[in-house]
Amino acid sequence: VETILLVILVVVTVTMIIAVLLQRSEGGALGIGGGGGNAVDHMLSANLEGVEFINANTDSQALHRSGVSKVMQLGEGLTKGLGAGANPDVGCQAATEDRDKIAAALEGTDMIFLTAGMGGGTGTGAAPVVAHLAREKGILTVAVVTRPFNFEGKKRIAAADQGIKELGELVDSLIVIPNERILEVMGGKITLLEAFSKANEVLLNAVQGISELITRPGLINVDFADVRTVMSEMGMAMMGSATATGPDRSIEAARGAVCSPLLEEVDIHGAKGLLVNVSAGPDMELAEFAQVGEIVNEYASEDGTVVIGTVLDPEMEGELRVTMVATGIRNRTLTPQITLVKDGEVEDAVE
């Protein structure tokens, strides 16, 4: 059976870019990508298997600077290649102008990841248009979006919040990554480059954690139908990833993943769906896999669906990584415990 996945990423760095990824192949085909300078480079440097990037942007200069091989100009007649000017209405009009072009890219696709740097013009305005087109085609759509830093201003944050609200009504599952949390968790002395790099890493973890379950072999395999069950029509979602080493690595990685310090403050207890990727070398023990399962099952509702798969990576000898996506989350927390996971150790960072 041919399974086709499409990933569309809209990320803010210096410019706003929509990165559209498309690949077709037998079995479980995969498309993964990132947009905007460091995000694209980070995705490319990760050497994700079976990945093809296509950047689509309203800014023609940004497309020329793009490191990916395929590009798509959006709204050329409207913007003349000069970008959306931080105006979501222009971004929306640009995407609407090229609805047929976007729809053609979506054709035959089973799943997309839509990742947007919300608050700017192209991402905030174009992402809902793409999501709507995907919904019309019955494509499973998972959005992973960033919320601006506070220093980016109230107007940009307000635009982001409106865009997040609109996008949430169109996608199957929505994960929000507030950039401001990076400053809280990593400290105020972090450089701007490091802050955006960390955000790009979270974006990579989200896409990689889900896609690898479908595309890479493991002792316990997960197929596209499993992913659809957990993520279809679920609403608010949360993603966390952590890597640990040592005798308690499975417990530390699982706890670190569910704490998810860089993601939106949500209470995942009672989640309707849990999708878990346990990645490790061939030294992973059955008891470790069971420990991860016990911890993540604490957060699922009684009638929730839990899907756990493994990915074996020979280069991860001695390491164990847990990536978890919790879907169907109902309540936000007001003062969650934030935990920073580093080198296999779990430390309280912010309360």
Q: PLM features: residue spans?
A:
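Tubulin/FtsZ superfamily GTPase core signature
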Residues: 32-351
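Short terminal targeting/anchoring segments
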Residues: 18, 23-34
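Feature marks short, highly hydrophobic, charge-poor N-terminal signal-anchor/signal peptide-like helices
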Residues: 1-11
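Hydrophobic alpha-helical segments with strong N-terminal bias
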Residues: 7-8, 20, 207
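Hydrophobic core segments of alpha-helical transmembrane domains in multi-pass membrane transport
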Residues: 12-17
